[in-house]
């Protein structure tokens, strides 16, 4: 079965040749550009012949645009929280909506477009 046929059959509760397979991996400090993130995800899928890609940008991408400061240490170490924009209760009132098509989210969206 092709990857797509296997997934569609499984979702339709039909017999498959095997259970669809995927998993994710984070590539610390290698995944901050859209093209590199796409390359890493596609390479892992091809190497392991997975049925689908579970996109895995670095774990804190979703909070950076809200004002979280990261400590990016480099090497195999993942970025960690350096400073939160929330230091006192009133700080919650300063949080403004962020766009889902800009900033860190845009990096992830662009990587998915490239990988497609």
Label each region the model flagged.
Residues 1-116:
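Catalytic cores of TIM-barrel enzymes
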């Amino acid at each position: 079965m092709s990857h797509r046929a296997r997934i569609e059959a499984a979702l339709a509760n039909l017999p498959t040749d095997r259970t669809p397979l995927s998993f994710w991996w984070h590539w610390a400090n290698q995944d901050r550009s859209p093209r590199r993130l796409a390359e890493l995800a596609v390479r892992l899928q091809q190497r392991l012949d997975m049925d689908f890609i579970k996109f895995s940008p670095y774990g804190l991408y979703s909070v950076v645009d809200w004002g979280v400061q990261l400590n990016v240490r480099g090497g195999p170490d993942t970025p960690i929280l350096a400073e939160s924009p929330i230091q006192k209760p009133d700080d919650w009132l300063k949080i403004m909506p962020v766009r889902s098509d800009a900033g860190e989210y845009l990096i992830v969206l662009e990587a998915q477009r490239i990988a497609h």
